[in-house]
Amino acid sequence: MVDNMTTTQIEVGPGATNATINFEAGILECYERLSWQRALDYPGQDRLHRLKRKLESRIKTHNKSEPESKRMSLKERKAIGVKMMKVLLFMDPSAGIEGFEPYCVKNPLTRKCPNCDWAYYPPTPGKYLDDIEEEPEDVDHPIEVVLRDMNNKDARQKIKDEVNTQREGKFCLTIKRDICNVMSLRVLVNGTFLKYPNGDKSLSTLHRLNAYDQDGGLVAKLVATDDLTVEDEKDGHRILNSLFERFDEGHPKPIRAAETAVGVLSQFGQEYRLSPEEGDN
């Protein structure tokens, strides 16, 4: 294990995603009010229009992954975003907003805690690979695929076959693979399958990927955003195959988390989610 290798973390879940979208919608509302007052210069007007297009696209994508009862329009998110700004500006820990709950530093389990220091995002723990890292969420009857003695073609087909047999809902796929006889990685993937009336299934969302070495140490970690969705079943297989190919490139050093993240995110054209530092590591 190399001490100076860092994990790559990319966004962290539905609460943070909703909070970000709603907050940006609040910013858009402020831009529009300035525009109504003719207080925006030309660059400001350009930013307004670009932000609006970006939000409309992101909300449309995000709503696909939400139950119908939780889907919100841009107008609804603007109202929540403005309230969130008030929470931020006035630091009112009692004004909880859906998707944006105050966080008590002293007692994370207590939402309403008088005389506490409040922060909206807790301090980020150390980023070294030997930090304690929870495995992806437990799933009933997870599938384990052992690929130690298979060539690439057969292994890819086996992954595809296993994926096809999954029921709808969350799944956990454990892939074990020897890499140039140097190390065997245990790869845990959490995702969500959708089942359609015609019987077809598709991998709709990739939530998390962890890779561990033979000693159980974390080698690579990817936490995917809610809107990193897969459009169809073929894309789901392509992503899993891409992961397998990356792990099969084997070299004597542990795989860097940033490399793993790039391999996954590039399937979605989402490389921009990595910071320049992460991309270079």
From Swiss-Prot:
One GO biological process term: symbiont-mediated suppression of host type I interferon-mediated signaling pathway
Superkingdom to which the source organism belongs: Viruses
Family: Belongs to the influenza B viruses NS1 family.
Listed InterPro entries: NS1, uS15_NS1_RNA-bd_sf
Subunit structure: Homodimer. Interacts with and inhibits human G1P2 conjugation by UBE1L.
SUPFAM superfamilies: S15/NS1 RNA-binding domain (SSF47060)
UniProt key word RNA-binding: yes
Species of origin: Influenza B virus (strain B/GL/1954)
Molecular function, one GO term: protein serine/threonine kinase inhibitor activity
Region of interest (G1P2-binding), residue spans: 1-103
GO CC annotations, alphabetized: host cell cytoplasm; host cell nucleus
Name by which UniProt lists this protein: Non-structural protein 1
Record motif Nuclear localization signal, residues: 50-55
Region (RNA-binding and homodimerization): 1-93
Function: Binds and inhibits the conjugation of the ubiquitin-like G1P2/ISG15 protein to its target proteins. Since G1P2/ISG15 is an early antiviral protein, NS1 may inhibit the host antiviral response. Prevents EIF2AK2/PKR activation, either by binding double strand RNA or by interacting directly with EIF2AK2/PKR. Also binds poly(A) and U6 snRNA.
Subcellular location: Host cytoplasm; Host nucleus
